Amino acid sequence: MQIKNFGMVCVATFFSLSAGMAHATSGGEPAGPIGGSDVGSAYLPPPGLYGALVGLNLDGDKFKGDNQQVSQENPNSLFKITEGGAALLYVYPFQLAGGSLASSFFYGALHQHIRLGLPGGHNIFDSDTSGGADIYSDLLIWSRYVGHLGSYAPQGLHSAYPYPLPYGLTIAPALSLQFPTGSYHNNAAPSIGHNYYVFVPNISLTYLTPPITSWDEGVEVSTRFYYDISTQNHSQNYRSGDVLALDWAVADRVGLWKLGVAGSYAQQVSDDIAYNKPAYGTGNWFRMFAIGPVVYRDLPSINGFVKAKVTFEPVSRNGYPVTAVVLAIGKRF
């Protein structure tokens, strides 16, 4: 069964930003769309051009070091980012091997305030800057409905949508790329832009279960796996380590609403390399885990959607544990 009229219900996944992107590490960190992926990450809408506006606020302090504990060397640290971004998604008017094809584009501008503070109130640095972020693009996405795999809509189900929902499994492999277009200054620590490319092969899976109550239409379970491969920053003779990342969401579908929990996990899997040696003697490995509520609603009157997500970060290694607030609104042009 190929779902051909799945509308804006599945657009929001591509207009989200990963809280994991908000870490001021010198090296490995996850690259991805503004806010990360969450609900419906494997779905594509019908052919056409879609756009969205996304806002992000990140607030953290108490830099955690290599042992995942608050750094005693920098107890007065601070991390704040406010970002606004725009996203475009184009779904091509043809299919390949039974699946839809699309490309996306994300661009944001941000203000960041980052401080590393020594005991006694002295600062290593206190950076307060604004500028454009690196461009992120899903160069090509291929989304295909695989099958029911045990999940069927019950007879007589009353749905808020005039078309069938894709009960079962949908997959969406993609090839993505982060471009070094952001504001970069070699002596800024850290700079907003990264001055290197990040290649991001990834795959999304979304499974919609049958309804579990008399008032819902099923539970939607989504995951998106990324493998981030960074090129070398030649101006600093530094290469960030590869990062394995996962965005996920579990949401109950209730009419035009999706209500659930979303999160991210990222783990660096190879050393940062500086001047042909492991950076800082340890490889500067990065890790993070974030979790929090997500709320999504379709807006049929404008053929659009609105979404809000808040995540908290109980696990952080070589980064700032942040509280992330993401707001997004989008529609079809």
Regions found by a protein language model. Name each.
Residues 25-26, 40-48, 60, 93-102, ...:
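Short loop/turn motifs that connect adjacent beta-strands in outer-membrane beta-barrel proteins
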Residues 26-30, 58-83, 118-127, 190:
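Surface-exposed strand-loop-strand hairpins of Gram-negative outer-membrane beta-barrel proteins
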Residues 29, 64, 70-71, 232-333:
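Outer membrane beta-barrel transmembrane domains
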Residues 32-33, 51-59, 103-111, 171-179, ...:
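Transmembrane beta-barrel strands of outer-membrane/channel proteins
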Residues 39-41, 53, 86-92, 137-143, ...:
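Residues on the lipid-exposed face of transmembrane beta-strands in outer-membrane beta-barrel proteins
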Residues 47, 78-86, 128-137, 169, ...:
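Residues that define the transmembrane beta-barrel architecture of outer-membrane proteins
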Residues 60-62, 110-116, 146, 178-188, ...:
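Sequence/structural signature of outer-membrane beta-barrel proteins
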Residues 75-146, 171:
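Long, hydrophobic/aromatic-enriched structural stretches that serve as scaffold segments
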